[in-house]
Amino acid sequence: MMNSPSFVSIASVLLALLRPGMLVGQGIDLVELTTEAIQEAYAAGEYTSVDLTKAFLERIDRYEDYYNAFISMNPKALDIAARLDEEYRSSGPRGPLHGVPVVIKDNMDYSGLVTTAGFWGFSTAMGGIDMIPSDDAAAVERLRDAGAIILGKTNLPDFAGHGTRTNSSVAGVTLNPYNVTKAPGGSSGGTATAVNASFAVLGLGTETGGSIQNPSSAQALVGVKPTYGLVPLEGVYPINGSYVDVVGPMAKNVYDAAVTLDIIAGPTTDDFATFAAVDHI
């Protein structure tokens, strides 16, 4: 039994995640990387946005088949990183997330990428119809305006309809990198697994009834469920858009979660519920 392929594969992946996340050819420790450390490294010229993005993409390529965190990847991530490097050289950092690789849950719009909400009917690859937005969700646009690089869109149960497991009709089952026999939490389990497995520095999840808190608890992350109206819901596929749906950050440390919340919070004319938060920001 000890020599069975499944045991060896699982054991090797778990051991790999316990080791420092140094990647051959990039020399960047991804496991403990923070937004502050990234900005310090960029300022010191230790590496570039392209270097960092390549490192994360290499790690995803190496381990994603085991954990299944993603529904889709952003094919333009490296091009965006290159443009951010040019911008950095000419005018400095765009914001606190300049060149920071992040992920978003696949019920949030990203211009040009399919939004499935985990449902096979919103994917031509599964026999449905692709839903391709022309604009970013408000929270996603704010991440990008702050310099973040969206690496991909993460798995979720169909229509974010489960709070313990993350199993979609589009991408199947997402696993928990800490223990693949345990649930990753849901419905933002894909984002939690991506951050936990060091596929990204941080990510966005959504919550209606525990969907940020549950996977954050299951995977030892800092997840923030904001007050309704603090973060715009424009461009997010709703479960209950009346007063309980929220978008929030998921990260490995409090600082990164707080910085991200500061970036995505605030009013927008496309979501009038956000104007109630103006005096509380």
Segments and roles (model prediction):
Residues 1-10:
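Bacterial N-terminal signal peptides that target proteins for export
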Residues 11-17:
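A broad helix-preferring feature
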Residues 23-25:
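Boundary at the C-terminal end of the N-terminal hydrophobic targeting segment
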Residues 27-209, 227, 247:
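Gly/Ser-rich catalytic/binding loops embedded in alpha/beta enzyme cores
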Residues 197, 225-281:
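A short helix-breaking turn/cap at a secondary-structure junction
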Residues 213-218:
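Structural signature of FAD isoalloxazine-binding scaffolds in flavoprotein oxidoreductases
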Residues 219-225:
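Ligand-binding "clamshell"
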